Amino acid sequence: MRFTAFLACLLVAAPAASARQDLPTLSPAQAISQAASASPKSVRALFQFKVQSAAESRGGYYLDSEKDFHSAANLGVSIRPSAMPGLTKKYGDDLKSAFVGKTIKLIGQVRRVSVGQKGGVFATQVEVTHAGQILSVS
């Protein structure tokens, strides 16, 4: 019985791990280009970059690949409140200190999102809804 349960766990976990390995790892420039080409659809991938800035927002957090989050070259990571408990447990309450200046690797879907009240201005973002999407910080 235990062996059967163990095999069942392996069968469930193995496809998820291999699917992660099959995803490309994109730089911010590659992510922005692919999101623009696929818009309005999103692109699932791994993303890796050095965090240049971070800010709290409405119970969540934003991480940016550029110091100026308005930059067209910026890849933003929108961390939703649902991910905050797991992230603060793992990295502490001061996420800004935990991430800024460090290289992060995460899994998710990148897309162009309309920002501002007038529309016509877009940002490229990856949404993090659970802490497990952030795979490494170094």
Give the residues covered by each predicted segment.
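Positively charged n-region of N-terminal signal peptides that target proteins for export
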Residues: 1-5
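OB-fold single-stranded nucleic acid-binding module
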Residues: 20-138
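N-terminal signal peptide c-region/cleavage motif recognized by signal peptidases
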Residues: 13-16
